Each structure stands twice: as structure tokens, then as C-alpha cells.
Design a protein with these regions (language model features):
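Membrane-proximal extracellular/periplasmic loop immediately following the first transmembrane helix
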Residues: 1-45, 50-60, 142-144, 165-167
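Hydrophobic secondary-structure segments that place a key small or acidic residue at a functional site
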Residues: 49-160, 164
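Internal alpha-helical transmembrane segments of multi-pass membrane proteins, especially GPCRs
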Residues: 214-217
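"Rare, low-scoring activations can occur
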Residues: 143-212
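Structural beta->alpha junctions
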Residues: 4-14, 46-50, 122-126, 171-179, ...
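Structured segments of extracytoplasmic/periplasmic soluble domains
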Residues: 22, 26, 98, 185, ...
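Residues embedded in well-ordered beta-strands within globular domains across many folds
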Residues: 33, 109-111, 170
Length: 218
């Protein structure tokens, strides 16, 4: 579902803390995160350089750990930045390389939809969360849309995009074998809150490249 093209879906409420707590009570689940995403983001600039086609994520404080990210340089977001709607950003290495020489990212100001965001950190997926690529087909499966990722706090997301956008969820499970069962349980929890039962929009568990490392995308 592409919000930027189709608008906000009807009857899909914003996910809340109680739902995350319910998800964390699933025996197979280790951690969980709710986030928002623009799958194809334009309007991202540093001076005269632009990044088109990358992703922008509005993340909660659990996202980096749940998805296996580690800091390369700088720091992650702190609670004051979430609470005070600070315009700060994290870049993955691909996005960082689009704008800066290595090591020159921190403290620089990029623009997202005309709003200034200060880069506070550069992140990458931990090696244990990266897939082993054995063929060109697998490469395109995992990396064909890897044009860079910019992360901002979920609290400041409406400054750039829209209020009350539906979130996505990701969980980490104890073992890869737990993914299917846990994913279905999370899917049920999230869909219980959808008010418009006739809508074509619902949450559905989806296997992504992290499935080999105990992650499940919702």
C-alpha cells in the first residue's frame, strides 16, 4: 500500500503501546518495533546533492535493536529527541555515501521535504543479519531497491509527512523456526484494531531477507 499515491486508508488506527506489550507477550518474540515508511522517497538533499529512490523511516526507540542495526559512527536517537520532536536523522552507509565523504556526516544538515535534519549517526546492519548471497537472483531479491535509508524519529514524522499514518511492525524471534507462528499471532493482534472490515487494507506477515536470522516483517 503506497500512502503517497493512495492516501491514508480508512479504518486503520495508529498502533499503540498496549499492542506492542501484547506482541511482546507472544512466547517466541524477543523484541518488537513499530515504524512508518516511505518506500520511494524524493526531496532529500544535502546542498546540491540529492538522494532519490531511497527509503525514509520514522522509527521508534526499539527499531535499531530489533532489526539488527549497529552504529558505525555517532549515536542513536535519545529520549529527549523523541519527546521534544527534534529534527535529527540517522543514515545507513549507502545514504551517507550519497552525500558525504566517509567520516564527514556527523553534524551536517540534510533537508527532507524542505525541513532541516541534523545527522547524528551512521548505521549498518550487523553482519549476522546480512544474508549470504549465492546467485544474481538472490542479489536482486535482497538488494534491488537498496538506494539508501534515512531514519528520523516517529514523533517528528508528521512534520515531514502526515499525521496518523498507519505503521508497520517488525519483530525479532528466538529462532528462525519461530517466525511463521509468531508472525501470524502478530498479524491477528494488529488486525483486531482495524475498524473498517470491508477495507482492502490489513496487516499481513511477510518474510523478508532477515528471516534467516529470526526476524519477521509485519
Amino acid at each position: 500500500y503506497q500512502i503517497e499515491y493512495e492516501g491514508l486508508p480508512q479504518g486503520v488506527p495508529v498502533l499503540n503501546k498496549s499492542q506492542k506489550e501484547e506482541i511482546l507477550e507472544i512466547p517466541e518474540v524477543v523484541s518488537a518495533s513499530f515504524y512508518r515508511m516511505r518506500d520511494y522517497a524524493d526531496g532529500i538533499y544535502y546542498q546540491d546533492k540529492s538522494m532519490d529512490g531511497g527509503k525514509v523511516l520514522g522509527i521508534d526507540s526499539d527499531y535499531l535493536d530489533t532489526c539488527g542495526y549497529q552504529l558505525v559512527r555517532g549515536r542513536g536517537f535519545n529520549q529527549k529527541e523523541y519527546a521534544n520532536f527534534k529534527k535529527v536523522a540517522l543514515l545507513d552507509e549507502t545514504a551517507a555515501n550519497s552525500f558525504f565523504e566517509k567520516g564527514e556526516e556527523l553534524g551536517k544538515t540534510i533537508e527532507i521535504k524542505g525541513e532541516p535534519f541534523v545527522v547524528v549517526g551512521v548505521v549498518k546492519k550487523s553482519d549476522e543479519y546480512e544474508p549470504v548471497i549465492n546467485s544474481i537472483e538472490e542479489y536482486y531479491t535482497y538488494y534491488n531497491d537498496e538506494s539508501g535509508i534515512v531514519m528520523i524519529t516517529d514523533s517528528v514524522w508528521p512534520v515531514v509527512y502526515q499525521y496518523d499514518e498507519p505503521q508497520q511492525a517488525v519483530i525479532q524471534t528466538k529462532t528462525p523456526e519461530d517466525m511463521s507462528q509468531a508472525g501470524k499471532a502478530v498479524q491477528q493482534i494488529l488486525n483486531e484494531q482495524i475498524q473498517n472490515t470491508e477495507t482492502s487494507v490489513s496487516y499481513k506477515a511477510e518474510d523478508i531477507m532477515e528471516k534467516a536470522k529470526g526476524l519477521q516483517q509485519i
